[in-house]
Amino acid sequence: MTEHEIREIVDVIDYNEITGIDICNVLNDALKGQDFRERELVTAMPINFMVDGTTSIRDPKGLKGSTLETRVVISTVPKEPLYRILEVLKLSGVETVDISFTSFGDYYTVKNKNYDDVVGAIINIGEESTNVSVFNKGIQIKNSLIPVGSKNVDKDLTYVFKSNLEESRKLKEKFAVALSSLADSNDTWNFKIDKDTSKEVNQVGVSKVVEARVRELLKLAKNEIKNLTNREIRYIIITGGLSELAGFSYLVEQEFGFVAKVCNIKTMGIRHNMYSSCYGTIKYFNDKLDLRGKHYNMISNEDVEKLSSTDSLVTTSENVISKVFGHFFVD
């Protein structure tokens, strides 16, 4: 991923009111002259807007003015690997509307007014790797990938206790405590090594293995933040499925201090940190469209009318609801 800042200014169409069209125009003009032959544009994130020289306006829609200026951070990636992913989605019957970085989604999940004014970092512990991103006033300025993730914990448990990977994952998610000092030596777990052999482990032993790997991972992420920036970090958010481990927040506090905290998604139905990138990406996409005065809906206007009509038959409404949920749940 490559990022750099550009600046552009355009004349406003109607002095009496700046609209989403004006914002689209200034952002599109900012991209003119950029070399996208080898790289694909992923995001054009406006830092701020200026109306007739007035600075630090986040959303100028509705204001009066003759000129609109912006500073934009653009992010690009190599075309070839991205196009391979898009081709797989196309063959799967999935329409690609837009592309984004998962780190943007993580930020929009935890985004608030305080974070929009300072420098901070977000750590997402994935299955195969850990993503470390640094944000300045809500704009991603640095990003790095550590090739260690939650699956490494599963492999450690498999190596130590001779369990298969599936059983190791259950041990990690349902039995282990991230901080072994909080574990109970009297709490045990039984599992089969093969059809004739069973094994019993206690919570302290399992938790020590988990803690060792998770602590190492957090130290790697901490060092990576230092490598990415020398600015003062005002917040650190840790997310990803592994952050749901029992006692994880205590381990985070030991490694980072009170500057760090674990993501806490409160939205009903997705109260798990494994969804942070997906949930935040939806919010980011909606915010992006709102700034440009645009809207996107997965449901057609006809279906909306059927769903809201009091004259519709119950069966019709049920069909529409099924269609809506069909976008998210497939048998």
Which residues make up each language-model segment?
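Glycine-rich phosphate-binding loops at beta-strand->alpha-helix junctions
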Residues: 177-179, 232-252
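Short, solvent-exposed amphipathic alpha-helical segments in soluble enzyme
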Residues: 115, 252-257
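A conserved active-site cap/scaffold subdomain adjacent to cofactor or substrate pockets
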Residues: 147-169
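Gly/Thr-rich phosphate-binding beta-strand-loop-beta motif of the actin/hexokinase/Hsp70
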Residues: 1, 112-142, 157
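Glycine-rich phosphate-binding/hydrolytic loop that grips phosphoryl groups
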Residues: 264-307
